[in-house]
């Protein structure tokens, strides 16, 4: 679910590395939820979830700056998609997490993983050739 696939590569090393990191962070939460059922992972999950929020915001800002710098025509629609995930992550707060109901966390992380992979394959791939033609690899 959270593994990197070569099919996700947009052929821009810095962006690919950031995408890999997003999958890695989400995977850490998933792994925590599925290990050691007798141990309360709430604080760790919250800490990693915060890191996921922060890194997602960092990645989106970086990607959007590149789009603006190189004059990518679909920047505005791309930003709207980014905003959707940011709002979803911000909406998911401490009160929404019940470690006794792991399914709520799994649901969020599955959504994030599916959203990221879908976004990369459908939306980010649109800028792959554009960036490469502008010398960005």
Language model: regions and residue ranges:
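Small-residue-biased structural context
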Residues: 1-137
